[in-house]
Each structure stands twice: as structure tokens, then as C-alpha cells.
Amino acid sequence: FQSYALLPHYNVFDNVAYGLKIRKVPKDEIREKVLNILKLVEMEGMESRMTNQLSGGQQQRVALARALVLEPGVLLFDEPLSNLDAKLRVTMRTEIRKIQQKVGITAIYVTHDQSEAMSISDKIIIMSKGKVEQIGTPREIYYHPNSRFVADFIGEANFLDAQVLEAGEEKAK
């Protein structure tokens, strides 16, 4: 949600309901679904507020609610926190993760922020120049990077030139 793409002339309720109305879902079902999803994203009671009266974090929640209310099979997040300040980024990534797990939806989360990727993901794909460098859990990638690029990208790393004299199963001299 680099751009939240909210409809500025619609209130929160109508922004979230928009996709359901396009699909011609009955009004009573729309109301129930929208109110339930707004509760999930902690925006209940704000249905009548205009989107330009909301903070960045609240706008993000409305955009997330609008996507979730349609019950997609997969949700794509493209740099969703890039427009938020550092403190709100931490709060929102925790919220996104919590909501994603509660709903049980598969999410693809694109980010250049390593700490964000490590904290929100079950599985990470690290890419460089359009090529997959490594796929694994955050723990696997952090503790067992398979290339210098991955090690440098994920953590604070020191690289030392060395010569292996003897190789064992777990250690080298």
C-alpha cells in the first residue's frame, strides 16, 4: 500500500464496502462483513469518518480492511509500511502479522527492510537483480546464509579473507 488508493470522497465504511458493492453483495451482508472486518483491523466506530481525517496508520488499516473484506486467496503487500514513521512501522508490522495469522490468509510481503522481513515472515525469498539468492525461514537465512550477498544483506557481517587448511563436518581450520 505505498499508495493506499482510498477513495477520498467516501467515508471509511464506503471505502471498505466498495468491492462488495461492485460484486452486488446484498446490503445487509455488506454491512455485516464491513463491520466485522473493521473490528478486526481495530477501526470500529470510525465508519463515518472521511479518509482524509485519518492518520497514516488508520488509512493503512482501511486499505487492509478493504482488501480482506473480499476474502482473497492471497494478499500482496508491496512495501506497505514505506510511508510510515519508524515507530508506526513497528506497530503496523505487528498488527499486519497478527491479522494475517488470525484470518489465515497467505500473504506475499515485498520489502527492502530486512528487519521487517525477518519479523513478519514464515518464509523469506531474497532476490538480487531478479534472481533468487536464497529461500528459507528467517532463522535459516540469518544463521546459514548461502552466499556473501545474503549474509551482507541480512545482518551485520564481517568478511575476512581466509584459507581453509582442514575441513571437518562442522568446523574448518
Which residue ranges define each predicted feature?
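ABC ATPase nucleotide-binding domains
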Residues: 3-152
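ATPase nucleotide-binding modules
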Residues: 146-173
